């Protein structure tokens, strides 16, 4: 066991050093391609913040601005066209992802430091080179950039939101034929997924009694499925929550509702429970990514290293590491797979002779790289120090049943995360399903899971069973 782990780490050092170089080269490749297709150099997060050139957005329509904020030993610098952002919602993992290559380049930078410093001081004395810096701590998003990037999919499915003036999330609704549902259930999918994760598995398998009493609402998160995919969005927690509140809670006038969430969706579900404590009737979490952050450790970096440990085995950990650490390699994967998802669906049907349903491919590939990259860092990693506070609030202030399901063979999010939820919320019921992983916790056992959900919803009508400790 010790030898295999050492071998895994040793091979990982070599493999990820090669990937560091590849990502570095792809950075220049995409800058060139972006300029060729869009007549503009697009900024990326591997660019050193001190070299950014901030300008004022001014009053020009569509003008760009650079937002800068000092945080510790580095600056957060964001180039955007949005009129509304939240710097406190931006994860430092976007800017600080140290690699062997960056450590080597720091040696060169240290050598040039004195020369550069002298040049900078001389420039500061010259009025003509004075920079206008716009520092923003908290603002709000008001417009969506509606033009998809050249590297994103332009098919009718992925761009259907562009033809609508209503910039709301897509919500798949199933309700009783008489439109007289007694209760509401909101489903929130996970990372690289969509509402089809629920509609193709659970919705057809609910009992007739449940279908006649509950209104089911499965939402496509911002940047996924049929929902808007603004390429200038930073996909922060506040943006996601505001869109869910506007598109689901306000749109359907939900006063009370049950919440069912998977993986990434668990973070959003907990945040919703904190904002609407009196509206939650039950809270069901599947594979919640909760990591208890040790004291004195930066939460964002800790969660990133737990989820993406830079190891080549198992394959799930390797894939998560590549997606998390390499902005340009992950964009290449998106360019090859997401932009050609219709071809992949066709080939899958052809090779399996239509014996395999392709809804998982739709959920996995119908997003933009900008959406997946920012959601991963700003929600999953950026919430490292927030989930614990959310759980404390749910324990003390949200009077509802809490149920947690986890696959015993989940290689992406370990089952220890669910036990951590139990320690924070003692009344939570933990269900570890043997021989199931991150996806098969639902897919393949949808009938059984549908019955389990119905039992939770029925039980939630008895308050004394889940009174707050």
Swiss-Prot record:
Disruption phenotype: Defects characteristic of the loss of cuticle structure associated with an enhanced accumulation of cell wall-bound lipids and epicuticular waxes. Reduced expression of abscissic acid (ABA) biosynthesis genes (e.g. NCED3) in response to osmotic stress (e.g. polyethylene glycol) leading to reduced levels of ABA and high sensitivity to osmotic stress and drought, especially during seed germination and early seedling development. Increased aerial tissue permeability to the toluidine blue (TB) dye. Enhanced transpiration. Strong decrease in total cutin monomer load in young leaves and flowers. Keywords: Abscisic acid biosynthesis, Cell membrane, Cell wall, Cell wall biogenesis/degradation, Hydrolase, Lipoprotein, Membrane, Palmitate, Plant defense, Secreted, Signal. Its main location: membrane. The active site is at residues 189, 263, 410, 438. Induction: Induced by osmotic stress and abscissic acid (ABA). It comes from the Eukaryota. It is a lipid-anchor. InterPro entries: AB_hydrolase_1 (IPR000073), AB_hydrolase_fold (IPR029058). Expressed exclusively in protodermal and epidermal cells of all organs, especially on adaxial sides. One of its GO terms (molecular function) is hydrolase activity. A lipid is attached at residue 46 (N-palmitoyl cysteine). Its EC number is 3.1.1.-. GO terms for cellular component: extracellular region; plant-type cell wall; plasma membrane. It is found in: Cell membrane; Secreted, Cell wall. Residues 1-45 form the signal peptide. Residues 185-439 form the AB hydrolase-1 domain. It is an enzyme of class 3 (hydrolase). GO terms for biological process: abscisic acid biosynthetic process; cell wall organization; cuticle development; cutin biosynthetic process; defense response to fungus; lateral root development; positive regulation of cutin biosynthetic process; positive regulation of response to water deprivation. PANTHER family: HYDROLASE, LYSOPHOSPHOLIPASE BODYGUARD 1-RELATED. Controls cuticle development and morphogenesis, by promoting cutin and suberin monomers loading. Involved in the regulation of abscissic acid (ABA) biosynthesis in response to osmotic stress. Plays an important role in osmotic stress and drought resistance. Required to ensure a reduced permeability of aerial tissue, thus preventing transpiration. Regulates lateral root hair development. Required for infection by the pathogenic necrotrophic fungus Botrytis cinerea, probably by regulating structural traits of the cuticle. This is Probable lysophospholipase BODYGUARD 1. It comes from Arabidopsis thaliana (Mouse-ear cress). The gene is BDG1.
